[in-house]
Amino acid sequence: MIIEAKVLKFGDKIDTDIIIPAKYLKYTDPQYLAQHAMEPLDPEFYKKASSGVIIVAGKVFGMGSSREQAAMALKAAGVKAIIAESFARIFFRNAINNGLPVITLQNATKEINQGDLVRVNVETGEIVVNGSKVLKGKGISGMPLEILITGGLITYLKKAS
């Protein structure tokens, strides 16, 4: 599974309240949630992400409240993958279950810049920046990879039954 897109870059400790503020949790439509993704940090995020982007972030991306809507909103907004130095465990699994690839890369925010063109091999974790710089992140394998390839946990379970 290869993903390529330009980078939107964020720092450390991007919590789920930033990803999708609590006032929107009563809504279930992914497209509506997408319009409010990252709103407290970047009100223009939806416009920037809609063409398809890869988020690069620092430590503990997705920390805070456990809300599946965070991964759902990012994916619906146009986020193709997230590369971060570390992820909150629950967010990591919610992302996989929603079909949103998440790759861990040490020093991600030092190695990759805003606007860089990045190609990610989700299985191997290889990341190519601007066609030349090669980085090695942690790939995804086994059942989590199968879930991603099928588009998320619900699709995976439907195909398995």
Swiss-Prot record:
Keywords: Amino-acid biosynthesis, Branched-chain amino acid biosynthesis, Leucine biosynthesis, Lyase. It catalyses: (2R,3S)-3-isopropylmalate = (2S)-2-isopropylmalate. GO terms for biological process: L-leucine biosynthetic process. It comes from the Archaea. SUPFAM superfamilies: LeuD/IlvD-like. InterPro entries: Aconitase/3IPM_dehydase_swvl (IPR015928), AconitaseA/IPMdHydase_ssu_swvl (IPR000573), IPMI_Swivel (IPR033940), LeuD (IPR050075), LeuD_type2/HacB/DmdB (IPR011827). Pathway: Amino-acid biosynthesis; L-leucine biosynthesis; L-leucine from 3-methyl-2-oxobutanoate: step 2/4. One of its GO terms (molecular function) is 3-isopropylmalate dehydratase activity. Its EC number is 4.2.1.33. Transmembrane segments: none annotated. Belongs to the LeuD family. LeuD type 2 subfamily. Catalyzes the isomerization between 2-isopropylmalate and 3-isopropylmalate, via the formation of 2-isopropylmaleate. Heterodimer of LeuC and LeuD. This is 3-isopropylmalate dehydratase small subunit.
